[in-house]
From Swiss-Prot:
Transit peptide as recorded in UniProt: 1-68
Consequence of gene loss (knockout): No visible phenotype under normal growth conditions. Extremely stunted growth, failure to develop true postembryonic leaves and arrested primary root elongation, when grown in vitro.
Provenance organism: Arabidopsis thaliana
Name assigned to this protein: Protein root UVB sensitive 1, chloroplastic
Functional description taken from the UniProt entry: Involved in a root UV-B sensing pathway and in the protection against the hypersensitivity to very low-fluence-rate (VLF) UV-B. RSU1 and RUS2 are probably both negative modulators of the same UV-B perception pathway, which when overstimulated in the roots causes a block to postgermination development. Required for polar auxin transport by maintaining the proper levels of auxin transporters AUX1 (AC Q96247) and PIN proteins on the plasma membrane.
Impact noted for substituting residue 342 to G: Decreased interaction with RUS2
Gene name tied to this protein: RUS1
Pfam families recorded: UVB_sens_C, UVB_sens_prot
Note: Several mutations in ASP2 (AC P46645), but not all, and any of the non-phosphorylated B6 vitamers can suppress the rus phenotype.
Keywords: Chloroplast, Membrane, Plastid, Transit peptide, Transmembrane, Transmembrane helix
Cross-referenced InterPro entries: RUS_fam, UVB_sens_C, UVB_sens_RUS_dom
Quaternary structure and interacting proteins, as annotated: Interacts (via the DUF647 domain) with RUS2 (via the DUF647 domain).
GO CC annotation terms, alphabetical: chloroplast envelope; chloroplast membrane; plastid
């Protein structure tokens, strides 16, 4: 019997027989597809198993799969033979018709049985591997289900997995171009564009939390300032003779004289730059008041055209001084906003914000100026409204600023609270309590809601205000020391310090050595706070300077406490965000030099 015979017309005839009725040679050449499919549940389970491990089993050879199917068919066929024979000897009862093939059949059957067992165990291993891989893919799928964002500054882009290319792709690429032109997307793109041009890169993580509120208020005040500027410029032009047939050369000379005299104020005011570092909020508010006063004077020039140069020069001086103070204090604010030391970025975006507000203000100012015309009364009324808005927004913007440096008032408030409660206060708590000018008590304009908050102790606030008034940095040695014993006692006590502290006529006099640093001034202020605490809480009143320098004296006790606790106070303050690199102060220029001339100084007639 040839193979071609079995694979052609008679294959269906042979395949229709029972497996026990087919000879061993026919079994070898009978195609796997022509076998009668069993109906047992074991075969169904086998099919499901094959489907589950398809990726593993597909790598096996065709011969292995054919043998496996033959084994299952033989096994199930034998079972059918047993069922058909009833009480007979099973499938082998009828299969013994061909005695010449019995021995070869038994050997092949044994081989098929062993091969089937091998394939069975292979199936079990493949199934276990497939289950493990499926569980692993499930766990990976859970991880993929977690949202992944690509962040660039304030712009976020959601990434989704592409399982075909095995990579992450932007979610935006899944949408059509038409879907990106929706009003929501256009609004988002405009917002991203404004953020890119007007806010520092990495916002809000690249700046401090008070930056946005300050910028918003500053934008409104910038608009109001430009409106006032347009109205003032219009008044100046009317005063100089615009539209009244004035000689252009005379008008130009008056204008140049006005600006030239005004520039002198900026040069003279530059020597007081250290004042602006100590109280930048108060000086900035003063600069805004000065600027508005200058605008008001310029608007009065049409009423008094004969005093144009005088009034214009005074107004120009005020505007120049205000511009200098604004530029100086703006640097202090920008340095505080740059939480990642991105000073140039913050300054550049601040200038961009200023240009936007100025452009809007100029447009609104032109509209208001056209509505007012030449009426001075209407111009003054509009100026009053705009100035009120300008000053209110300025005040709100400065209240938003959280200064992290330590000037004498803030340092005294921090140290006093530390001595009372054992903890350094938060930055916001101290800035909310600090008045714009500590020496001017009414300058601390707090809202009624904030007046109800008593976060800091009243003792600490009273101590900070009192120390601010009584402190004198850079005192003269000749004004404090009156005899040789006091000088020797102070020099010996503060031998290893960069300053000399004593109390004289109710004032805390700090004499700075030539090598003293801002850190030494901060250290001296910590000792001043402890001296004040000893005076108010321990009842230790000041005695003579010589007695206070002895062991057990006020100066000796306070200096010993400073040497033990100053570093702890610094660390506690730094932990809440304070910059403790040094004291921001304006000391007097006098310094003390100690060295080879010390004996000569102490033995001089002036010291006795």
């Amino acid at each position: 019997m040839s193979c071609s015979y079995l694979l052609s017309g008679d294959a269906s005839v042979v395949a229709s027989r029972r497996w026990s009725d087919v000879s061993s040679r026919q079994r070898l050449f009978l195609p796997r597809q022509s076998l009668r499919q069993p109906s047992g549940s074991s075969f169904s389970r086998c099919v499901r198993l094959v489907a589950n491990v398809n990726d593993h089993f597909s790598k096996q050879s065709l011969a292995t799969r054919n043998c496996l199917a033959s084994v299952f068919s033989a096994d199930l066929g034998g079972s059918n033979g047993n069922n058909d024979n009833g009480n007979g000897g099973g499938g082998g009862g009828d299969g013994g018709g061909d005695n010449s093939d019995d021995s070869s059949f038994d050997l092949r059957y044994l081989c098929f049985l062993l091969l089937g067992l091998s394939c069975f165990f292979h199936f079990r291993l493949s199934a276990a591997s497939a289950i493990a891989k499926d569980q692993n893919s499930d766990s990976n799928g859970d991880a993929v289900k977690e949202t992944v964002w690509e962040v660039r500054g304030s712009k976020r882009k959601r990434l989704v997995p592409d399982f075909v290319k095995d990579e992450f792709v932007s979610e935006e690429s899944a949408f059509e171009l038409s879907s990106s032109l929706t009003p929501e997307n256009l609004l988002a793109q405009c917002r991203n564009l404004l953020t890119q041009f007007l806010l520092p890169e990495g916002f809000p993580n690249s700046v401090t939390s008070d930056y946005l509120d300050y910028s918003l208020w500053r934008g409104v005040q910038g608009i109001a300032s430009q409106i006032s500027g347009v109205l003032a410029t219009q008044s100046l032009l009317y005063a100089v003779g615009l539209g009244k047939g004035a000689i252009p050369t005379a008008a130009a000379i008056n204008w140049v004289l006005k600006d030239g005299i005004g520039y002198l104020s900026k040069i003279m005011l530059s020597k007081y730059g250290r004042h602006f570092d100590v109280h930048p909020k108060g000086w900035r508010l003063f600069a805004d008041l000065l600027e508005n006063a200058a605008f008001g004077m310029e608007m009065l020039t049409p009423v008094f055209p004969q005093f144009f140069v005088m009034i214009g020069a005074a107004a120009g001086a005020g505007r120049s001084a205000a511009a200098l103070i604004q530029a100086a204090t703006r640097s202090c604010f920008n340095a505080g906003f740059a939480s990642q030391r991105n000073f140039a970025e913050v300054i550049a975006k601040g200038e961009a914000q200023g240009m936007v507000s100025k452009s809007v203000g100029i447009l609104l100012g032109i509209v208001v100026a056209n509505c007012i015309g030449t009426s001075t009364s209407l111009a003054l009324a509009a100026f009053g409204v705009v100035t009120t808005i300008h000053m209110y927004t300025n005040l709100k913007s400065y209240q938003c600023i959280q200064l992290r440096t330590l000037n004498p008032y803030r340092a005294s408030l921090v140290f006093s609270e530390y001595l009372i409660s054992g903890q350094a206060p938060l930055i916001k708590e101290v800035n909310d309590e600090e008045p714009l000018f500590p020496t001017v008590r009414f300058s601390n304009m707090k809202s009624p809601e904030k007046l109800q908050d008593f976060v800091l102790s009243s003792e600490a606030k009273a101590a900070a205000a009192d120390i601010e008034e009584r402190l004198q940095l850079g005192s003269k040695l000749s004004d404090v020391i009156h005899n040789k014993e006091e000088a020797i006692a102070l020099f010996d006590l503060y031998r290893n310090e960069g300053y000399i502290l004593t109390e004289h006529k109710g004032r805390f006099c700090v004499m700075l050595k030539e090598s003293s640093t801002p850190q030494d001034m901060l250290r001296s202020l910590f000792q001043v706070n402890y001296l004040y605490w000893l005076e108010k809480n321990a009842g230790i009143e000041p005695a003579s300077t010589y007695s206070d320098c002895k062991p057990g004296g006020r100066l000796h006790i306070s200096l010993d406490y400073v040497r033990r606790e100053f570093e702890h106070a610094k660390e506690d303050s730094e932990s809440v965000g304070w910059v403790t690199e040094g004291l921001i102060a304006r000391p007097l220029p006098t310094r003390i030099r100690l060295g080879h001339d010390r004996e000569l100084l102490l033995s001089s007639p002036n010291s006795s």
